[in-house]
């Protein structure tokens, strides 16, 4: 009679924890640096007046649209490349990077041309304010030239991350941060003999920092990296048709999921935008807190994604299951810590913003809702994206998000708003999916049907 093997909920494989830390730390630092770049931009441009701030914000919405599309390409690259990395199949990884680069350049080129040809029309879709449109057009027509450079650097960073080289992204982002902040100060306000350029200076600083970021990524990939050893000819060679089909098949639902999330984000802003300016300010403050805490959650989830893809690609199903159980326990702990962190500093955090007392009161209420919702986010997001999606079931997250967004989140928030509910109640409706998805995640993850080897 054989004895059933006891399930292990916390793996004793020390390499899991070492790899998790080695990947999560630089990815989280890269996210923090990216956050710092945006924060520095907002801080400096805010001194130019409301129209300039609004113009930059609206201009950046076009760039955000490209970033969402690129997230789909980058995630597809990471999932497929990580699984082939588990097999140490560098030939297939290079072909995946080639496909990603072509897709990224196509998206970047289309978005760039649209922004250059129809800048005021695109800004006009977002706001009727003529002064904001004028400022946004100035900014967008300069920043648009950076879109191609951005796509190249993001694909290279994603490729390096998939083969467990996450530090390169952090280092490249740090270079971009230094360049961006330095040039912002020099060009916006005029320094070292350079005339003050205002919003044009902010746009030029962003463009130059993107060029430097792209150049650093290319130099690293071509002359420093020893794992992939990329060459220019790798991007122009013939690609296996079956691999190209896999890229489209598994990438399409990921891209669709990003589009759904973009619609969700814009609509949520519109719902809260119908309340008073104090509520809108409170929502902005809560958004800053979300971005801050999401840095480490996303970094850890990205690390789990690489580990999962590599282990699935190696064919060790039992180890994947063991890692999945450990991941669930670990991120429950992360959720408790994150919730406690938000609740602990919310009173101090709202005082950093020069807003009315009413806005601070709303913000404090929103942060309580956010703290509770982050309990769910910290569990379901790493489980569904870091395990299920990276493990091979790339379409499930798209279907799950679509159902929750269009059948639960937006309808409940719209109804609550229409009935005159308190803003905090509406905000809770907008965040309720983060808790509800935990039920789905528990069932989906522990059935293990998501473990699919996508390699050939």
Locate predicted features.
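Short runs within selected transmembrane alpha-helices of multi-pass transporters and secretion channels
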Residues: 74, 143-162, 169-177, 202-218, ...
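Small-residue hotspots at the loop-to-helix junctions and early N-terminal turns
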Residues: 50-61, 136, 140, 203, ...
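Helix-terminus/linker motif at the lipid-water interface of multi-pass membrane proteins
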Residues: 32, 36-54, 123-130, 186-197, ...
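Short alpha-helical transmembrane segments in multi-pass integral membrane proteins
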Residues: 1-27, 81-148, 194-251, 308-374, ...
């Amino acid at each position: 009679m054989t004895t059933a093997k006891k399930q292990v909920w916390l793996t004793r494989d020390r390499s899991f924890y070492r790899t998790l830390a080695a990947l999560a730390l630089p990815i989280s630092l890269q996210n923090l640096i990216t956050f710092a770049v945006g924060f520095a931009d907002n801080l400096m441009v805010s001194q130019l007046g409301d129209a300039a701030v609004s113009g930059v914000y609206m201009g950046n919405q076009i760039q955000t649209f490209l970033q969402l599309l690129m997230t789909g390409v980058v995630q597809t690259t990471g999932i497929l490349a990580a699984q082939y990395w588990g097999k140490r199949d560098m030939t297939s990884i290079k072909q995946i990077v080639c496909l990603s680069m072509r897709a990224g350049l196509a998206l970047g080129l289309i978005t760039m041309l649209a922004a250059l040809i129809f800048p005021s029309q695109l800004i006009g879709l977002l706001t009727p304010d003529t002064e904001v449109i004028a400022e946004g057009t100035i900014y967008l027509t300069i920043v648009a030239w950076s879109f191609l450079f951005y796509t190249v650097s993001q694909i290279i960073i994603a490729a390096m991350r998939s083969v467990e080289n996450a530090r390169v992204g952090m280092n490249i982002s740090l270079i971009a941060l230094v360049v961006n902040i330095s040039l912002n100060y020099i060009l916006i306000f005029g320094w070292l003999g350079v005339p003050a350029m205002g919003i044009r200076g902010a746009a030029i600083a962003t463009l130059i920092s993107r060029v430097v970021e792209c150049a650093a990524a290319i130099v690293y990939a071509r002359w420093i990296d020893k794992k992939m050893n990329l060459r220019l000819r790798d991007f122009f060679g013939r690609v296996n048709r079956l691999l190209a089909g896999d890229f489209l098949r598994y990438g399409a639902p990921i891209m669709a999921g990003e589009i759904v999330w973009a619609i969700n984000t814009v609509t949520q802003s519109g719902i809260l935008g119908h309340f008073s300016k104090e509520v809108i300010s409170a929502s902005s403050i809560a958004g800053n807190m979300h971005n801050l805490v999401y840095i480490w959650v996303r970094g850890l989830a990205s690390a789990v994604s690489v580990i999962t893809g590599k282990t699935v690609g190696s064919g060790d199903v039992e180890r994947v299951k063991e890692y999945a159980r450990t991941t669930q326990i670990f991120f429950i702990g992360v959720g408790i810590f994150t919730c406690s962190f938000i609740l602990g500093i919310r009173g101090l955090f709202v005082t950093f913003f020069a807003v009315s007392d009413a806005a601070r009161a709303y913000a404090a209420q929103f942060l309580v809702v956010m703290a509770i919702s982050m309990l769910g986010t910290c569990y379901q997001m790493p489980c569904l994206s870091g395990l299920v999606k990276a493990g091979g079931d790339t379409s499930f997250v798209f279907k799950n998000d679509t159902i929750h967004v269009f059948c639960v989140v937006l309808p409940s928030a719209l109804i609550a708003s229409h009935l005159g509910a308190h803003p905090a109640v509406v905000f809770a409706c907008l965040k309720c999916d983060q808790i509800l998805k935990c039920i789905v995640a528990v069932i989906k993850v522990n059935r293990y049907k998501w473990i699919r080897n996508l390699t050939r």
